[in-house]
From Swiss-Prot:
This is Cell division topological specificity factor. Signal peptide: none annotated. Pfam families: MinE. Keywords: Cell cycle, Cell division. Coiled coil: none annotated. It comes from Parasynechococcus marenigrum (strain WH8102). NCBIfam families: minE (TIGR01215), PRK00296.1 (NF001422). GO terms for biological process: cell division; regulation of division septum assembly. The keyword Translocase does not apply. Belongs to the MinE family. HAMAP family: MinE. Prevents the cell division inhibition by proteins MinC and MinD at internal division sites while permitting inhibition at polar sites. This ensures cell division at the proper site by restricting the formation of a division septum at the midpoint of the long axis of the cell.
């Protein structure tokens, strides 16, 4: 999530449909390039959330684990808002 995305979210602005479509396309391309099937990605998300939850309380409703591609490099990105440490 970029700073602009955060500002837009705080101000209640809706993303442009072109931006949404671009993000979805990037996600599809990232999945294709990584050769990870959706079931494996879901399992990874659950396990990442489980491990992080052992150390800090996270906001699951706002958290996100996704694949992002930039300059032909795919990264697994976890954006997990921390409520407090345990």
């Amino acid at each position: 999530m970029t700073l602009q995305d955060l500002i837009d979210k705080l101000l209640g602005r809706q993303p442009a449909s072109a931006d949404t479509a671009r993000q979805r396309l990037q996600l599809v391309l990232a999945h294709d390039r990584s050769d990870l099937n959706p079931e494996l990605l879901d399992q990874m998300r659950r396990e990442i959330l489980e491990v992080v939850s052992r150390y800090v309380e996270i906001d699951l409703s706002e958290g996100d684990v996704s694949l992002e591609t930039e300059d032909r490099v795919t990264a697994l990105v976890a954006n997990l808002p921390i409520r407090r440490t345990l």
